[in-house]
Regions:
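Short N-terminal "domain-start" leader segments
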Residues: 1-30
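Short amphipathic alpha-helical segments, especially helix-boundary/capping motifs
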Residues: 2-3, 37-38, 57
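Compositionally biased, low-complexity repeat tracts
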Residues: 20, 45, 67-69
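A short, structured beta-strand/loop element
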Residues: 24-42
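A short, exposed loop/beta-hairpin motif centered on an aromatic-Gly-Thr core
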Residues: 38-54
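A short, charged, amphipathic alpha-helix used as a generic interaction element across diverse proteins
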Residues: 51-69
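A short, polar/charged loop-to-alpha-helix boundary motif
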Residues: 72
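Intrinsically disordered, low-complexity charged/polar segments
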Residues: 76-88
């Protein structure tokens, strides 16, 4: 089920942080009501490992969201994970 919803007012995009398995987290990004990204695992990390905290999933989800809104390439790198202190 959905754990938290972060709505960006005056914007057509929204981020949802979701529970993955028993103890992990992922995120979904919607454009209005259309689901455009489902990310149940930490990107660019080998193996299918979910984020360890709501904060990590929210942080990376927000970075992707900001890049999408800016019209930029939104792929995540290991440097992004390191810069934001995401545990992987």
């Amino acid at each position: 089920g959905i754990m938290y919803v972060y709505v960006h007012p005056v914007n057509r995009y929204r981020l949802e942080v979701t529970r993955v398995g028993g103890s992990g987290y992922g995120y979904k990004i919607y454009e209005r009501e259309r689901l455009i990204i489902v990310q149940p695992f930490i990107p660019v990390v080998s193996g299918k490992r979910p984020f360890q905290s709501v904060q990590d999933a929210q942080c990376i989800g927000n970075l992707v969201l900001e890049r999408i809104k800016a019209g930029n390439e939104f792929a995540i790198s290991k440097a992004d994970l390191d810069n934001l202190g995401v545990v992987y």
